[in-house]
């Protein structure tokens, strides 16, 4: 009985607060900057906006983990692999949200290419798997993501991203449609060491979310980051450090209603291919 009550409670919490977590932001860098992601060029673009990995030139492997509100049932895991080739960049990714009796899983294959500094495009194909518990049939769906980025100047980048534009349907009793997510934003290098970012996200299941983030490179390999976003009202901060070929990022965020979440991520730079 207690197990069933816990399951029902978590399901209601997930649907009301997160409205599915299929397009959740991966990587502590973005998490620390108010969940900003759409105009960044980094490893976790493979999850957040595939266009951002178009210029990524290092074979890399990464993992991230988020503990939300000190509840293991709301854990969020990400893993990804990025492979640059002569004609673009490929990426593989996996994410999982939830726990044994309820979890959302996303498997992705991405490709991005820079046609010029002014046009970078990325496409990602997703296979979605939902596990409710042993008493229910697993639910599956397929969708895709598109990203565009443009470096207007050496200091200014504009990004656009859309998840699930065809409003994929999950075959259940009520034929639930998964949300469409659209992001638009820009990043601006105020100086070579200081980055300012802003972004708006539309989710067909929620109100608009406005995001603002700052990143400061205090030392050669050390970064400090802060950010806020509005839905729900959340403040965040974090730090990042590059140790040889390993990038270590940690962050924390405070939601006004539900409390503190922590995220950490590791990126391993394996090799720079001869392209």
Write out the residue ranges for each language-model feature.
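Sec-dependent N-terminal signal peptides
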Residues: 4-14
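Bacterial Sec-dependent signal peptides at the C-terminal "C-region" and cleavage site
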Residues: 15-19
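Subset of outer-membrane beta-barrel
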Residues: 20-275
């Amino acid at each position: 009985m207690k197990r069933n009550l816990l399951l029902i409670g978590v399901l209601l919490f997930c649907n009301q607060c997160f409205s599915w977590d299929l397009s959740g932001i991966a990587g502590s860098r973005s998490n620390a900057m108010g969940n900003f992601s759409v105009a960044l060029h980094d490893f976790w673009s493979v999850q957040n906006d595939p266009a951002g990995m178009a210029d990524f030139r290092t074979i890399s492997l990464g993992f991230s983990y988020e503990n939300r509100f000190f509840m293991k049932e709301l854990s969020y895991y990400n893993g990804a692999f990025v492979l640059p080739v002569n004609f673009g960049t490929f990426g593989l990714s996996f994410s999982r949200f939830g726990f044994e009796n309820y979890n959302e899983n996303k498997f992705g294959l991405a490709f991005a290419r820079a046609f010029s500094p002014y046009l970078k495009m990325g496409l990602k194909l997703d296979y979605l798997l939902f596990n409710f518990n042993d008493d229910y049939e697993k639910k599956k769906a397929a969708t895709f993501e598109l990203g565009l980025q443009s470096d207007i100047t050496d200091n200014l980048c504009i990004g656009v991203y859309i998840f699930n534009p065809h409003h994929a349907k999950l075959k259940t009793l009520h034929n639930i449609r998964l949300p469409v997510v659209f992001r638009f934003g820009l990043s601006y290098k105020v100086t070579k060491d200081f980055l300012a970012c802003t972004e708006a996200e539309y989710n067909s299941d929620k109100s608009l979310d406005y995001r603002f983030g700052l990143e400061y490179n205090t030392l050669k390999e050390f970064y400090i980051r802060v950010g806020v976003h509005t839905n729900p009202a959340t403040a965040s901060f974090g730090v990042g450090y590059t140790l040889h070929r390993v990038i270590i990022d940690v962050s924390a965020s405070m939601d006004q209603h539900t409390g503190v979440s922590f995220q950490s991520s590791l990126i391993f730079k394996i090799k720079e291919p001869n392209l």
